[in-house]
Amino acid sequence: MDTKQKKRSHSETNGSQKAPKRQKIQKTSKKQKKAAPKKPVAVDSLPWNEVTMPDMFEDAEGFYGLEEVDDVEVVRDGDVVTFVSSKIQTKNNEDEEFEGFGDEVEDGGNAATDNTGEVKPILKPTEESTKNDVPQGNKQKIEKKAKPEKKDKKEGSNTEEGEEKVPSKKEKKQKQEKPQKQPVDKDATLKQDPLKNVFEALDEDAAGEVEVSGWVELDLSSNTLMALSKMGFSKPTPIQSEAIPEVLAGHDVVGKASTGSGKTLAFGIPIVEKWLEVYGELDEDELKKSTRPPTALILSPTRELAHQLTEHITTLCKGMPTSPYVAAVTGGLSVQKQQRQLSKADIIIGTPGRLWEVISSSNELSAGLKQVRFLVIDEADRLLTDGHFKEAEEILNALDRTHGNEDDDEEDTLPPRQTLVFSATFHKGLQQKLAGKGKQSFKDDSQSMEYLLKKLNFREEKPKFVDVNPISQMAANLKEGMVECGGEEKDLYLYSLLLHHPNQRTLIFTNSIHSVRRLTPMLQTLNIPAHSLHSQMIQKARMRSIEKFSRTNNTGSVLVATDVAARGLDIGGVQLVIHYHLPRTADMYVHRSGRTARAAASGSSILLCGPEEVVGTRRLVAKVHAQNALHGEGKKSKFYIRSLDIDRRVVSRLKPRVTLAKKIADSALAKEKKGHDDDWVKNAAEELGVEYDSEEFEALGGGRKGRGTGRRMKEKEARGMSKGEVGALRAELRALLAQRVNVGVSERYLTSGTVNVNDLLKGAKGEWLGEVEGIGMEDD
């Protein structure tokens, strides 16, 4: 009898599960819906559309009148060509399918099946209506039962399709015993002591805000002042206090200020103010529905600077009731996503290459950019250099381009556009190469302004020129130094400088990508947290390196980068900049050194100077600090770039470490390069239809002598190291790194050295065993 009762209860549970069973059939029926079959059609019956020519296409000639069609397959059988498409059939049946769906929703009775017995999908509104009929007390139970069913469908089970898994008794008991989650009372803490907790909440909100009385003179809106208060800016910088009123007054502005002086907000605040003036009273729903042209277009020379500008302006707009939509258009990211963002963007920030690629393929985007109210060119001296950014010139020409059939009245309907240009260096003489021969002419500010006026189409004849530091381009709190060393000893002195500045965020600049790829693994082998950044890295890897380097808890990190990181990057806490190579131009030295000593902070810039770089270093000092010498201003010290003396005895103790690390890093780099070269030659041989033999190819090229022979021999030697030899070198280096560098302890007489034995007994930590003097940067 007991078994029968169990069977009956089991059948009752099956009978009670009919409604979920229909839900299962309903969802599987959607998957079984077949696509419309494709049939051969005539060419004339296809829905041809006329091709719209882009505005950037200057000479179309015979390409006018082209037509295109989508979703068509071309099938060729011998000499017979047929066109296969499903478009005509879908057009004929489109209305019938829509009417059928509407009838099924209204019937509600036999909506799941028709006369033929075929399963049809049930729309979601019927499910919602059944939920509304259930009392509120039982809604939670129904929802809880529905959630495990979704998990079973995702995970899959042994039951066949269309059947439903019957819950066991244990599962039922667990569901019944499981207590329901009671809603959390968010105001529980306030109920305990309302007055106390309310004022604590107000104190927490106001903790990060500062007084913004210094911004009142600029006549900014209350939303902008509140945002500046949350960002912690109590007063404007000199470039902001002079440039913002001119921009708000409607003038074209050329702004020059030292690195780290707040040039981003100098043009970002007026742009946001103008947007709030025009669209600030609209709600979010009205903003989504409205179609409006972008307010500003900002051009940047590098991807990293573009993303940083986006972050700064987005932070400024955060917390406002209504704020502009900021979109970044850079390479390395999805083009389709950027096109969607541009369709609703109010402020567009991008690099010239990707921006030109996106807008040149869309007439709507190019037409919208012609209506921008602000054109901002950040780091203008770099963007407008001849032969560097061809796309930037194309974009500037496209913004001013008008068709011949357009009337002059249509041109007047476009809103007036302000052109804002900002950089730390406008001097043309700073862009000349330091390694060149002969005398190089200096150009004054008037010639630099003429250069800009030729490149840009300013609305005013003479834009407002704002120069807050006409004498020096360098930051006031920056200390500059130089270490003289041999060309092959730069790695050794670089490691010594890093050990002399422990727990300092350091940025190392090189002139080549190869140097970045070589130095980064070498420093990592020496237990230094080094990261790399160069233009051949994918965008995600570049952003990941900057993120790891700029973490607040990673103060001793090192970033080895090319000049791609020299302009505009604002990474907090960078205290030291090391120039592994002499910069090619003086303006690049200014921008490299500007990554430290930003705002009111202090920093150091050290140049590693080899014998072949002495002439270039003299020219660098003459160009960068010439105005200081003429005006008798600047630093009080005898030299503008002081020569630093590093103890040669200390450097010699570090040489075994660096030698081992170089061998390990060079071996890995040579093997990687060999594999890359072999793949390239092998692919070329396959394309030519020639058999490739690596040994024969290497034998043919081995007899050649000339430039690069010594380098190739070293690479071959490093490539020939086995795993065992590399492992032995790593073990030897590990033993050296485990010991502190002995710079003051006598191995024979313990008490005769300069080391404090008491500190040794206490277990004092550090890289040095003994006292090491500074390198002289601390002295004024």
Curated annotation (Swiss-Prot):
SMART domains: DEXDc, HELICc. This is ATP-dependent RNA helicase mak5. The keyword Kinase does not apply. The lineage of its organism: Eukaryota, Fungi, Dikarya, Ascomycota, Pezizomycotina. Residues 477-645 form the Helicase C-terminal domain. It is found in: Nucleus, Nucleolus. Disulfide bonds: none annotated. Pfam families: DEAD (PF00270), Helicase_C (PF00271). CDD domains: DEADc_DDX24, SF2_C_DEAD. Residues 1-47, 88-192, 700-721 are annotated as: Disordered. InterPro entries: DEAD/DEAH_box_helicase_dom, Helicase_ATP-bd, Helicase_C-like, P-loop_NTPase, RNA-helicase_DEAD-box_CS, RNA_helicase_DEAD_Q_motif. A motif (Q motif) lies at residues 213-241. It comes from Sclerotinia sclerotiorum (strain ATCC 18683 / 1980 / Ss-1). Residues 140-157, 164-192, 712-721 have a biased composition (Basic and acidic residues). GO terms for molecular function: ATP binding; ATP hydrolysis activity; RNA binding; RNA helicase activity. It comes from the Eukaryota. Belongs to the DEAD box helicase family. DDX24/MAK5 subfamily.
